[in-house]
Regions:
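Short hydrophobic beta-strand element within catalytic cores of glycosyltransferases
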Residues: 2-4, 250, 259-263, 268
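A short, active-site helix/loop in glycosyltransferases that binds the activated sugar's phosphate group
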Residues: 102-141
Length: 330
């Protein structure tokens, strides 16, 4: 595993325990592109891996070029659709688009994520494949006993718990989420909002919570290693993203049987059950809030793991397919 950070990752311990190796490079800052390129050259000359599977779009042309020069089979993997911000799209395209001339194979979490990163031509080729972002479905299995136990553990008995899992970035649109939740609170006295994740905008979101006087209604739980429990703690999942490659947490929420109220940025491939409602971001917070509460009046929760398995999003299935793919290219 090759990371562009010196910070310990959430999965480092598990990777090392399973026998994996972790290498670190400096974060990409723009001005250090050529220094990183030289480091890539040195690294792949001394580490002759047979397959390199790249997940960092903007630098993928550089490190996959160096890997291919040392006889690696080069895979590039798109996990996100285009940003809604023009300058971000332009910069990303300039840095990443050359990978279409370098990579041997192209993966994406959805057709749209593939088209946005690689173009329409690539996604029609035989060396492109949608590789679903899978989960261990059974970890999210819902039961009323599990739900009530978690409610008691977190002191949320008698509360209607709205939940969100995601980094605090512009893409996740937490500000609008808080606007929606504020409108919900005006109509629902027992509403609570749980925010799971970290990110550069976390402090600014906390200030908004304070300014809205929602401090006793919103809890920040940081990064968690028990997301399946979080999904079983929640009563409602709300996801107001501006853009998403797929919307993987929406799949996790469906596995736990949650009613999911998401933005139209969520891809069709991520909707695998009949308890997801997509609302346009053009709607104001009042319309979101009223629509959510109206749907909840008639919702009956049940376990959703079979929906996930049927849709091919269970990790045990995908791990086998990816293993076969790697073995066929060694």
């Amino acid at each position: 595993f090759f990371f562009f950070s010196d910070v310990q990752g959430d999965y480092d311990e598990e990777i090392l325990k399973l026998g994996g190796e972790i290498y670190h490079m400096p974060s990409f800052r723009g001005y250090n592109y050529f220094d990183l390129f030289r480091k890539f050259q040195t690294f792949f000359e001394s580490h002759p891996y047979k397959i390199v599977h790249g997940h960092i779009g903007s630098l993928s042309p550089a490190y996959l070029y160096c890997a291919k020069k040392n006889d690696a089979f080069a895979i590039v993997h798109s996990h996100a659709t285009n940003s809604s911000i023009l300058w971000e799209r332009v910069v990303f395209w300039i840095l990443s688009h050359r990978v279409t001339k370098i990579a041997d194979f192209f993966f994406a979490c959805s057709d749209k994520a593939g088209k946005d990163m690689f173009g329409k031509k690539i996604i029609k080729q035989e060396n492109f494949k949608v590789l679903k972002n899978c989960i261990d479905a059974m970890e999210f299995q819902y039961s009323i006993e599990r739900h009530e136990k978690l409610k008691k553990q977190f002191g949320l008995e008698g509360k209607l718990v709205f939940g969100h899992v995601g980094r605090f970035t512009e893409a996740k649109n937490h500000k609008f989420l808080l606007d929606v939740f504020e409108s919900i609170c005006m109509r629902c006295d027992n509403a609570m909002l749980i925010l799971v994740g970290r990110g550069e905008l976390e402090n600014s979101i906390k200030k908004i919570v304070s300014n809205k006087k929602l401090g006793n209604k919103v809890q920040f739980l940081g990064v968690r290693d028990d997301v399946p429990n979080m999904m079983n703690l929640f009563d409602v999942f709300v996801f107001t993203s501006v853009f998403e490659g797929l919307g993987n947490v929406c799949i996790e929420a469906q596995a736990a049987g949650l009613p999911c109220f998401v933005s139209s940025a969520i891809q069709n491939e991520a909707i695998v059950s009949n308890h997801v409602w997509r609302f346009p971001l053009e709607w104001d917070n009042e319309k979101w809030a009223i629509s959510i509460l109206n749907h909840l009046k008639h919702f009956v929760r049940k376990d959703g793991t079979q929906d996930i398995i049927n849709a091919g999003y269970d990790s045990s299935q995908m791990a086998h397919l990816l293993e076969e793919f790697y073995c066929s290219h060694v």
